[in-house]
Amino acid sequence: VVLLAGFPIAIIFAWIFDKTPQGFIKTDADITEVDGMNIKVDNRPFYLQKRNLFLALGVIAGILIGTYGGSSITKSVDDKSIAVLPFDNFSKSEDDEYFTDGITEDITMNLAKIKDLTVISRTSVMGYKNSTKKMKIIADELGVKYILEGSVRKLGNRVRIVGQLIDAKSDKHVWSDSYDRDMNDLFQIQADVSKEIANAMQAELSDQTIAQIETVPTDNMEAYELFKKARTYQYRSFRETDFNLAVDYYREAIELEPSFALAYAGLSEVHDFIIWMGYDISENRRKMVKYNLNKAKELDPQNPDVRLANAIHLYRQRNYFPAMDEYRAVKELQPNNSEIWERIAFIQYRVNQFEESLNNLLDAYKVNPKSPRLVVQVGLGYQLMFDYNNAIKYYDIAINLAPDISASAYNYKSQCILLRDGDYDLSLEVLDQGILRTSDKNSIWSKTTRLAQQGKYQDALETLSKEKSDFGNFLSNGAVIPRELLMGICYDGLGKKNLAKKYFAQAKDKMEQQVQNSPDDHRTHAGLGVVYAHLDLKDKAISEGRTGLAILPPSKDSFFGVYQVMALAYIYMIIGDHNSAIDQLQTILNINGGITLDHIDNLPEWSQLKKHPRIIKWNKTKQQS
């Protein structure tokens, strides 16, 4: 209690704020300029520094509260909060698990449309499937008052759904009912259940909300089951294999029901994500995004899920503010949809609103605390503001939630360990854990590049042999490079010059073709620049790096644009122009989403710059402050 009550108050106010007649404002230390870099230094004596006075007062307050205060701090629970647990599948076929899970999701999404309720996301409750935990424990873990549980039995063209609403604290059954109807009435059953629960919880239902809940997405139930399978894989992880399975199921659903707007919208989202992650940036993939999105808009332009797909596409085209408008419009219709808060947060840290972004992610986390993907994004929000302790905390939560699919959590955690501690061995150990549990392509590429940058060329080649992809991300997704470049670097380091020359030539040909295929993609230009740099084609390397940066500067995207600055800096470093490399890095130094001196000191890709006089001078000033 002492620590909880005293220290956070002292730390938050003392380290961040000053009291002024206008209220609390951020504390600013004296500014010292060193070789063009601004470094904050507080030169006042210890006893005159407000942060230390507040810290002392916080300790005293904590002791007083611990001695005389209450015995515990209780977590408040919203009186109209609910979690819909995965319904039990009482059907004979295991294939009906997707069908049963789909009903759970539909009822959850219906309730999420009711502004008067707080509804835990479907992603967070699926971990309780087949759980033997008591209702009160589950409710405490999810922070809700009510639990809805039920069962589904599908037999031929009939479906029986049983549901009961429980006040978890008192273990009192607030509502229960059963429905035994034809499969064609499924959506009406789900709507009836949702409205009955809302009434039992005394939630206000508007006519608009009722109309949304009663909307029928398709008359083809077989297509709808395939659609639900697709959504399961779409939101399962960031892995390419899951996205590919989602694509297959969406396509099957569309084959059965060519007028299924939501299936087209979902397919467009997955294709968009495959491009965004760098798995396939071909023009053909881009055409598939546009075709499916346009088809969805043509079929049902005002559907919230279609508008959500449109917002996602606008976002990925970096039309951020139109995307924000679409997201906010959908949020009015789906106020409990954590995905929308998450998407708004993504925009915010791309338009330099990092604190606002993190706040939205934390709000989303409250209603979706068991989603590994969302938890990773919360960790990234902290990492972008250089709070590595909190970042690692959330990455660990994601890994514990889903150790076999949270590939990005291992990767980001590995980065944070390097940045915070400079612990190269532990960083690689975390990557190895991720590779062992997930076989993730990006983790294998990250380990390969780190080993090569450390001069462990044979180990790098052995690691790369575990992943057969032609291309991979480099410099945190700032560039796409071919595997032949890494092989050339390794063989060159091993003294096998002829082999190195062969692979460098292949890398050059492949990247030039990539640029020709995707001339507007910043990552391909940056990747070609990196290849040219390693071939000592200096002018060409700089030109490609500058082109990548011109396509996506930080002013256009304060998240990914920073990586283009890094790519150009890396190119300058490889060709031996270290001053120009440092000039580039200086433009993103100590800004949220950028880099700190820890990046230069601890990340192996910047090892050539560590002993540069400018870096030494900056570090000396940092230590003195």
Protein language model regions, located:
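An N-terminal, helix-rich hydrophobic module
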Residues: 1-63
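Catalytic-center loop of serine/cysteine hydrolases
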Residues: 45-46, 51-79, 93, 103-249
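TPR-adjacent "capping" and linker segments in tetratricopeptide-repeat scaffold/adaptor proteins
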Residues: 76, 209-228, 298, 473-479, ...
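Short beta-strand segments enriched in small/hydrophobic residues
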Residues: 80-90
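Proline-centered turn/helix-capping motifs that create local helix->coil transitions or kinks
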Residues: 198-209, 300-301, 458, 539-542
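Short coil/linker segments at helix-helix boundaries
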Residues: 223-352, 366-377, 383, 549, ...
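Alpha-helical protein-protein interaction modules
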Residues: 314, 327, 331-332, 356-625
